[in-house]
Amino acid sequence: MFTGSIVALVTPMDENGNVCRTSLKKLIDYHVANGTSAIVSVGTTGESATLSHEEHGDVVMMTLELADGRIPVIAGTGANATAEAISLTKRFNDSGVVGCLTVTPYYNRPTQEGLFQHFKAIAEHTDLPQILYNVPSRTGCDMLPETVGRLAEIKNIVGIKEATGNLSRVHQIKELVSDDFILLSGDDATGMDFMQLGGVGVISVTANVAAREMADMCRLALAGQFAEARAINQRLMPLHTKLFVEPNPIPVKWGCKALGLVATDTLRLPMTPITDHGREAVTAALKHAGLL
């Protein structure tokens, strides 16, 4: 369940900014039908930063309900206060989620020892598998391989979503962890190469609009069929980059709307609607991928 194409799912909203259950079901059905391995609910792409604590939990529970056992659900449970991350994680202890994805604390920029103590404390309050999430471009905090190696010794810390885009991290981390520690790319543009170097999948933004293509690319890469996987990846490369032409999830939410997967591309402030330039860039990338 922690391999292949795992979608970092958008959180669809209606025109008033409320979570849209109808569109959420449509998205989940789309991923079930197109081979996505698992769903991450309420991660960065799911707008965790602009959902209240209560809404955050409610969206994960709604996702579980609508998935109805058809696809594994991973809960995003990150926060920059350790107590809040623990509280979020504990809410899902007996919920049915298969694990938690927990981002490094953002803005307050802890030391490496602070990161170790943060994730250790969370793991001590749950039996759920914990996937670390390192994305310094969003958090201002880079969890170094040595810290990952220390955390990997904790029983229920089972893997990491590495989103630096720095492929040398694969080798650096692999040298410090056991063979069964899960390495997932969090950067679509380098995900293919990440798997060729020993990663086992991608937690993907692109999969929101190209579920089948990402699932096929990951399946082929993990089977060692890299030429075939790379052919798909080349078709998707403009999407991998243009979905970040404006801050995530602005472009991908608009892409979901353009494909009819959600009713609106509504976001909550301070995220604002996609610009004309962004719309043109995403449209061109969707066409290049054969999706429009």
UniProtKB/Swiss-Prot annotation:
* UniProt entry tagged with the keyword Cytoplasm: yes
Q: Which UniProt keywords apply?
A: Amino-acid biosynthesis, Cytoplasm, Diaminopimelate biosynthesis, Lyase, Lysine biosynthesis, Schiff base
User: Reaction catalysed by this chain?
Assistant: L-aspartate 4-semialdehyde + pyruvate = (2S,4S)-4-hydroxy-2,3,4,5-tetrahydrodipicolinate + H2O + H(+)
The pathway where this protein functions is: Amino-acid biosynthesis; L-lysine biosynthesis via DAP pathway; (S)-tetrahydrodipicolinate from L-aspartate: step 3/4
**Location of this chain's protein in the cell:** Cytoplasm
InterPro entries noted in UniProt: Aldolase_TIM (IPR013785), DapA (IPR005263), DapA-like (IPR002220), Schiff_base-form_aldolases_AS (IPR020625), Schiff_base-form_aldolases_CS (IPR020624)
**Which family does the record claim for this protein?**
Belongs to the DapA family.
What protein name applies here?
4-hydroxy-tetrahydrodipicolinate synthase
Q: What's the name of its gene?
A: dapA
